[in-house]
UniProtKB/Swiss-Prot annotation:
Protein name, UniProt field: Glutamine--fructose-6-phosphate aminotransferase [isomerizing]
GO cellular component, one term: cytosol
GO biological process terms, semicolon-separated: carbohydrate metabolic process; fructose 6-phosphate metabolic process; protein N-linked glycosylation; UDP-N-acetylglucosamine metabolic process
Domain SIS: 278-424, 455-596
Top-level enzyme category: transferase
An annotated Gene Ontology molecular function: glutamine-fructose-6-phosphate transaminase (isomerizing) activity
Keywords: Aminotransferase, Cytoplasm, Glutamine amidotransferase, Repeat, Transferase
Gene label: glmS
Catalytic activity: D-fructose 6-phosphate + L-glutamine = D-glucosamine 6-phosphate + L-glutamate
Length: 606
């Protein structure tokens, strides 16, 4: 992983591919490369570092009608020029780029080595191109050799290949990894992410898992399954507004996306809510009838959103809710009762562990699967029974902000819908909840316009922070701690406030920074008790509380006040406070806010 881009057409492919790769950098990278075909030459260039490094190595005179490129985030082999994509076969006749992980690469590599194939990298990707080249030398059939190669692979992959014998052809394929075609007039773009080519084409085709495409200059796209049966695919038009990569005057994408949250909430509420209840179209095609348990599966920030959903749904509905990290779910062999509902959450819709969990649910009878996703046409969206889109728009910052709070809002609304269908919430309580959530855009703007941006952490030189919260605030603390780890590079751990006395309090010494979320009125007094425990051990307490809880100043060293709101809206507002705190601390420490080290935006490998 992390990003594929390619072009075939009448224009010069080289600058187009380099531009496309630069737009994929937000997904994560440690190296980049490009391969281009001319009539008599296969040109390959690679570099470690950002795409700008690659651009400096490619001559502006280089011209080709067919090229592929890749931004890499290391999974097999350290970041290096040798391990960067594209990879070529031992005769340097063809080049390939690949996202994903080939699980049987070692077996394939050993078999090829025994036949005299020489490898030049440590990657699983090189196995694919060497395997293809070996088959092509036997058969001379480009497409058949590509199809045969794909069927030998175990794991997940999206890949693109060019061959110097066929300078007018580009081959690409996918299996449980995203790949999108952008169609123009006598030209085709390919990318892991539609936003990378949206400037040039809004007509798209999404390759489904188990499909390959044959692109020829001046010819229509041909799509097949791996058995080479022809497939007809619909062309979809995507809105250019979905692809903005402009910072719009902000210093960082993360800050821009924090400020976009009121508009995101307005979009969600417009689609989902009417004045005192739900729009008829919300989950119209999906029934909760007969559901006896819920299983929420996700990774990272999406997992934290699922944790809040458990608290919220179980507070309203008399059914159990289980929340699992996707990477553990697949291997834990959990018992899933019939008449369960699985909710899978992924911003990108391509998170490998979450998709693996989806495969497990698909093996079960009488289990319905609902997706929560931000990307139409994604693998997750295409394979669940129904998908609710969070309408967050493109999120470029690696640390999730608007997508996370959009997930929170959608999950809270889903819980209210479930409670309403099961008649476990009164019409009056439902009306008050919906009205309270409809206040979110206004309250978010109010908070973002407050003095919060003047806040500076007096403990920014500390290397370890503790976050405490109870009930609805605990999952929000978990997310805040993750944000601090991701972009400020400090150790941060979140605990239920009541658990301090059961071990973590041993970490407290004079000056230890403890950030306490006091936003849940149901457990406010209990949370104050936790503050007193750590203050007695001379901790430095930063308290986040509602504006009506000014008394918090008497027991804390610093205070951040969040506008009063409905209890279901409060976690979202407190989550935004955590985002701003992490952003501010990252600035104080001088770290890379939008592209933190070692992290990728879309984790397409397990």
């Amino acid at each position: 992983m992390c990003g594929i881009f390619g072009y075939l057409g009448q224009r010069n492919a080289v600058p187009l591919v380099l531009e496309g790769l630069s737009k994929l950098e937000y997904r994560g990278y440690d190296s980049a490369g490009i391969a281009a075909l001319t009539k008599d030459h296969l040109f390959v260039e690679k570099s470690v570092g950002p795409v700008s490094q690659l651009c400096s190595k490619v001559s502006s005179d280089m011209h080709s009608q067919v090229a592929i490129g890749h931004t890499r985030w290391a999974t097999h082999g350290e970041p290096s020029r040798f391990n960067a994509h594209p990879h070529v076969d031992m005769y340097e006749s063809c080049a390939l780029v690949h996202n994903g992980i080939i699980e049987n690469f070692q077996t394939l590599r050993e078999d090829l080595s025994s036949k005299g194939v020489e490898f030049s990298s440590d990657t699983d990707t090189e196995v694919i191109v060497q395997l293809f080249a070996s088959r092509y030398r036997e058969t001379g059939d480009l497409v058949q050799s590509f199809s045969w190669t794909l069927k030998q692979l175990q794991g997940s992959f999206a890949c693109a290949l060019v061959h110097q014998d066929h300078p007018e052809i580009l081959l690409c394929a996918t299996y449980e990894s995203p790949l999108i075609l952008g169609l123009g007039e006598e030209e085709v773009f390919i990318s892991s992410d539609v936003h990378a080519f949206l400037k040039y084409s809004c007509q798209i085709q999404t390759l489904a898992s188990g499909e390959l495409a044959v692109l020829r200059i001046g010819r229509p796209v041909e799509i097949y399954n791996f058995e080479l049966s022809r497939i007809q695919k619909e062309v979809r038009c995507i809105d250019h507004a979905e692809g903005s990569l402009d910072k719009q005057g902000f210093d960082y994408y993360m800050l821009k996306e924090i400020y976009e949250q009121p508009e995101v909430f307005e979009r969600i509420l417009h689609f989902v809510c009417e004045e005192n209840g739900f729009a008829e179209s919300f989950l119209k095609e999906f029934s909760f009838e007969g559901i006896e348990s819920l299983h929420i599966v996700a990774c990272g920030s999406s997992y934290h959103a699922g944790c809040l959903a458990k608290y919220v749904i179980e507070s309203m509905v008399s059914i159990p809710v289980y929340v699992e990290t996707a990477s553990e779910f697949r291997y834990r062999q959990p018992y899933i009762a019939k008449r369960s509902l699985a909710i899978l959450i992924s911003q990108s819709g391509e998170t490998a562990d979450t998709l693996a969990a989806l495969n497990e649910f698909r093996k079960l009878d009488e289990v319905r699967v609902l997706g929560i996703c931000n990307v139409r046409g994604s693998v997750l969206a295409s394979r669940v029974d129904h998908c609710v889109f969070i309408e967050a728009g493109l999120e470029v910052g690696v640390a999730s902000t608007k997508a996370f709070t959009a997930q929170l809002l959608v999950l809270i609304l889903l819980g209210l819908k479930l409670a309403s269908q099961r008649q476990e919430i009164s019409k009056q309580d439902l009306m008050q909840a919906v009205q309270g959530l409809r206040e979110l855009p206004r309250l978010t703007r109010l908070f973002l316009d407050s003095s919060i941006h003047d806040w500076r952490c007096r403990q920014s030189k500390e290397t370890s922070f503790i976050f405490l919260g109870r009930r609805f605030m605990y999952p929000i603390c978990m997310e805040a701690a993750l944000k601090l780890k991701e972009i400020a590079y400090v150790e941060a751990n979140a605990y239920p406030a009541g658990e301090m006395k059961h071990g973590p309090i041993a970490l407290i010494q004079e000056g230890t920074p403890v950030i306490v979320y006091c936003g849940d009125p149901f457990v406010y007094t209990k949370t104050i008790g936790a503050i007193m425990e750590v203050k007695a051990r001379k901790a430095y307490v930063i308290a986040l509380a509602r504006e009506s809880n000014q008394d918090i100043a008497a027991v804390s060293d610093e205070q951040i006040y969040i506008p009063d709101s409905h209890d279901l809206a409060a976690p979202i507002l407190f989550a935004i406070a955590g985002q701003i705190m992490a952003y501010t601390m990252a600035l104080q420490k001088g770290t890379e806010v939008d592209r933190p080290r070692n992290l990728a935006k879309s984790v397409t490998v397990e």
